[in-house]
């Protein structure tokens, strides 16, 4: 079973408070999401393998460490996930970026894939799928399914705010995927919004309604 990590770092929690605040404007919301994504990326990459290399400092020859062998990919779920990409790339600029677009079928209410673009070497990469919110879990489940059916084998999921229902749904369908969360909230309301949550992340990020 994949693990669930909830980050309690003071900087993440401080910035998340302003992200949640309904009075935070589009510009600040966007910048704060970017900053929290960077802080979370620092934690999510903590277990990357290292190898020892020989270098020359200005003083003498030395042995030092570099990340070993891992090819990384970041996959935002369109559209709100786009706001987390640059924050991650600040720490791992060599990562390739894919995209998964989903819409909700008006009759079944289930997510339907309409766009997928991934790096050509899918099987060789470790992917971080990102979306600000994990509410019902439907979009995350379908996005990860899209990656797996194209050959991805090593996937992590990262979000700012999650509902217990979404975590349970994602674990039910993708038990091999670790989940990284800035805050695990109380529940979903009758409209499917996370409570207390942060509203509609896409609308707040892009200034739409």
Swiss-Prot record:
Keywords: Allosteric enzyme, Glycosyltransferase, GTP-binding, Magnesium, Nucleotide-binding, Transferase. GO terms for cellular component: cytoplasm. GO terms for molecular function: GTP binding; magnesium ion binding; uracil phosphoribosyltransferase activity. The keyword Transferase applies. It is an enzyme of class 2 (transferase). Allosterically activated by GTP. 5-phospho-alpha-D-ribose 1-diphosphate binds at residues 79, 104, 131-139, 200. Catalyzes the conversion of uracil and 5-phospho-alpha-D-ribose 1-diphosphate (PRPP) to UMP and diphosphate. Belongs to the UPRTase family. This is Uracil phosphoribosyltransferase. The gene is upp.
